[in-house]
Amino acid sequence: MSKKWYVVQAYSGFEKNVQRILEERIAREEMGDYFGQILVPVEKVVDIRNGRKTISERKSYPGYVLVEMEMTDDSWHLVKSTPRVSGFIGGRANRPTPISQREAEIILQQVQTGIEKPKPKVEFEVGQQVRVNEGPFADFNGVVEEVNYERNKLRVSVQIFGRETPVELEFSQVEKIN
């Protein structure tokens, strides 16, 4: 039998704990041959406060842990009896259904992309009022005209010398006005 990806439901907020405990139990029970990767899908997010950029992690699928495993009675029991695990998602209680290889690849790609390109924690919208906090237009207010999440840039209309002027700025150069 080959290893397949299964989705395990964990208590929300305890996903990393479940991952760690599962890895320890697999090693202790010498069941490494039945298990592959155990993932808590996260994405990095950029938060900008007072002009300072901080990068933190946000769970892509809160309450879920992905487990690559060969499903046997012993491997099923090891996962199911792990503290703070509610059970498997999909299929019947004693015979869960794995997610498709395509679904697994999409999730793994999202995880990789989230690590390489942090997403902004602050979501910007067209028409939103923002204040420029760094660069030549610092302390100017403007209106978001366009949002480009791939490049982490905004086109903001700023009033300069009485005229509306579009300016391209990085997410880190602006903050929302409440």
Curated annotation (Swiss-Prot):
GO biological process: DNA-templated transcription termination; regulation of DNA-templated transcription elongation; transcription antitermination; transcription elongation-coupled chromatin remodeling
GO cellular component terms, A-Z: cytosol
Family matches, as PROSITE patterns: NUSG
One matching Pfam family: KOW
Domain KOW, residue spans: 126-156
SUPFAM superfamilies in the record: N-utilization substance G protein NusG, N-terminal domain, Translation proteins SH3-like domain
Keyword Signal in annotation: no
Keywords, in A-Z order: Transcription, Transcription antitermination, Transcription regulation, Transcription termination
Top-level taxon: Bacteria
Keyword match Transcription regulation: yes
Family: Belongs to the NusG family.
Known function: Participates in transcription elongation, termination and antitermination.
Protein name as it appears in the record: Transcription termination/antitermination protein NusG
Gene symbol of the encoding locus: nusG
